[in-house]
Amino acid sequence: GLVIIATASRPETDSWVRELGADHVVNHREPMVEQVRALGMQHVDHIAIFNDMRHWETAVELIRPQGAIVSIDATNLPMPMDAMKIKSASLHWEFMYTRSMFETPDMIEQHNLLTYVSGEIDAGRIRTTLNEVMGPINAETMRAAHALIETGTAKGKIVLEGF
């Protein structure tokens, strides 16, 4: 199976990612290469970047030759690729709406994936990262959600629902 290394910088987020299934946790506010190597790993096979690309060079250093990095986040930051090239490592972007926006031949797969994942969630085999439902969509709750995100201490997904 996979060995999952998550990042967290506070005790409550460390505990949270372990509850979600992380085998190891490294602090993203400290040098991560050294922390991963202290776990006995020179390189890792796969890296998923879920929030921003500030740690791009760390990811490139840690990815194994012929490994893969995936990101869901756009960036305006520089992304030097020379080290990726010499490692023959790959970068993959994931965007939820690619299939429907471009009407790809496999567009039905989005439906299939969402159906599968919702079934796994309903069966309790997958936990979501939903952490807080703040109430109806209005100016007040939007400001409150945005303020929480701006603190840099939010964890998981924050949801506004209803009107």
Regions found by a protein language model. Give the residues of each.
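Adenosine-nucleotide cofactor-binding segment
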Residues: G1-W56
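Glycine-centered, small-residue-biased loops immediately flanking beta-strands
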Residues: L2, G67, A89
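Terminal peptide-recognition signature
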Residues: V17, I47, L91, V117, ...
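A general structural signal for well-ordered alpha-helical segments in protein cores
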Residues: W56, L113-T115, M142
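Helix-to-beta-strand junctions that scaffold the AdoMet/dcAdoMet cofactor pocket
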Residues: I63-R64
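C-terminal substrate-binding/catalytic core of Rossmann-like NAD(P)-dependent dehydrogenases/reductases
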Residues: A83-M134
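C-terminal capping/lid region of NAD(P)-dependent oxidoreductase domains
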Residues: D122-E132, R143-F163
